[in-house]
Regions:
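Short, low-complexity, charge-dense intrinsically disordered segments
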Residues: 51-60, 69, 87-96, 100, ...
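Short, amphipathic alpha-helical interaction segments positioned at domain boundaries
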Residues: 411-423
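C-terminal scaffold of the Radical SAM
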Residues: 1, 22-47, 98, 123-383
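Local cysteine-cluster metal-coordination motifs and their immediate loop/turn environment
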Residues: 8-19
């Protein structure tokens, strides 16, 4: 079981960003964390997340009785289907935030109450990983996270991976040290670039110097598992500049890099106004090669280095809880959508929508996620026609087969391969 925590507060809104975030509304911070804690406590009851004996003793009154918990108010999305058409086959970094985009759906109120529903939610074990994303988690005082982790800590597995995102300009050494005290052992910085003109183009409010300072502060705080996000495929990118980006990563000495191709999302300032680099696909391959030369091995289309257990869990199809506005959770064959509005979530954190996933839809997601990563596609998950198409791709050299799984030889061709296999 994984846990995703969404912090929507931002210092500014980047023109390429389609993730749920708000600028301002800091007066709601305390109420927002109260809502997330209430949401978490309700979900651990329903999904029967277990505590260790030691944690159960230590937590005392942390366990919440059903009589004192809030009430889930779920609606059902009966006709939702993943938006995996050829035009929209590029599943961007949303996958790293547990969210395959869905086409417009007809929503029908079903009056479901999760606490009393017939979903099969037997004990799912402990929480193996936590990912605090945003938004900008470092824009919120660490004291709020202390409250949150008082509720979460009793349910964590030993050696759980706990990641927080942070921006270089707001992640002070004090904040990073306090987050480490909460249990955080991995930090992901939204660097995006080391070039000042590119940072300005992307609407970032930090400079290159602050990236180096933030990474140094994280190391001083005792955080050694460090990721930096980079964006490539902008009109400013050239091979020479991307080579320098990779060299700067090497100089930082971080354990992980996420290198995303610029995605022009709908309903963002960039949509319809900004164009990609003319040779974006070739630049993407060039960037991959340079990052690997820096000593960080690719294990997913956009990820390199020490494997992020949380993201790996998404690609493996593990169950995950999700708390916070805009967050999306998953349990077996259901996806749960929290309110996509900050005020609405604070008012009722238990109101959610359910998307019921068919076996075919789950199979499709497994194919798309598997080809983009080291997870691969299980041979026994494919039907006869899909298996025949996979064999053709293996024969043509686009797939390799090992220990019962098919793997893409080039992650950049993953969507093309997936569409062909899925039929």
């Amino acid at each position: 079981m994984l846990l995703y925590v969404h912090i929507p507060f931002c210092e500014s809104k980047c023109p390429y960003c389609a993730f749920g975030s708000v600028v301002g509304k800091r007066n709601l911070t305390s109420a927002y964390f109260d809502a997330m804690i209430a949401d978490f406590r309700e979900q651990i009851l329903k999904f029967d997340v277990s505590q260790s004996a030691q944690n159960r003793q230590r937590s005392g009154k942390t366990e919440v009785s059903k009589q004192n918990s809030g009430e889930f108010d779920y609606t059902s999305e009966q006709t939702a289907k993943p938006n995996l058409t050829t035009k929209n086959a590029q599943i961007s970094q949303n996958l790293n935030r547990k969210n395959i985009k869905n086409a417009a759906v007809n929503q029908k109120k079903a009056g479901l109450n999760l606490a009393n529903s017939n979903l099969n939610t037997k004990e799912c074990g402990k929480i193996e990983t936590v990912f605090i994303g945003g938004g900008t988690p470092s824009a919120v005082d660490a004291g709020y996270y202390e409250r949150l982790f008082e509720a979460v800590a009793p349910y964590l597995a030993a050696n759980a991976e706990i990641t927080t995102e942070a921006n270089p300009n707001s992640a002070s050494q004090k904040w990073l040290s306090q987050m480490k005290s909460c249990g955080v052992n991995r930090v992901s910085f939204g660097a995006q670039s080391f070039f000042e003109d590119k940072l300005k183009f992307l609407g970032r409010i930090h400079d290159a110097r602050q990236i180096y300072e933030a990474v140094a502060s994280a190391k001083t705080a005792g955080l050694e598992n460090i990721n930096v996000d980079l964006i490539h495929g902008t009109k400013l990118d050239t091979k020479k500049r991307l080579e320098q980006e990779a060299q700067n990563v090497r100089n930082l000495g971080v354990s992980h890099v996420s290198a995303y191709s610029l995605t022009l999302e709908e309903n963002t300032p960039f949509a319809g106004k900004i164009s990609y680099a003319k040779d974006s696909p070739r630049l993407a391959k060039f960037m991959i090669d340079r990052i690997e030369e820096a000593g960080l091995k690719q294990y997913e289309i956009s990820n390199f280095g020490q494997i992020c257990k949380h993201n790996l869990g998404y690609w493996q199809g593990k169950n995950y809880l999700a708390i916070g506005a805009y967050a999306v959770g998953f349990w077996r064959d259901h996806r749960f959508y929290n309110a996509s509005n900050l005020n609405a979530y604070v008012k009722n954190p238990h109101a959610k929508k359910i998307e019921n996933l068919s076996a075919d839809e789950l199979n499709l997601e497994h194919i798309f996620l598997g080809t983009r990563s080291i997870v691969g596609i299980w041979q026994n998950s494919l039907n006869t026609e899909q298996e025949q198409r996979a064999r053709l791709l293996k024969k043509s050299g686009k797939l390799k087969f090992k220990n019962g799984r098919y793997y893409a030889k080039n992650f950049l061709t993953a969507d093309e391969i997936s569409l062909f296999i899925a039929g």
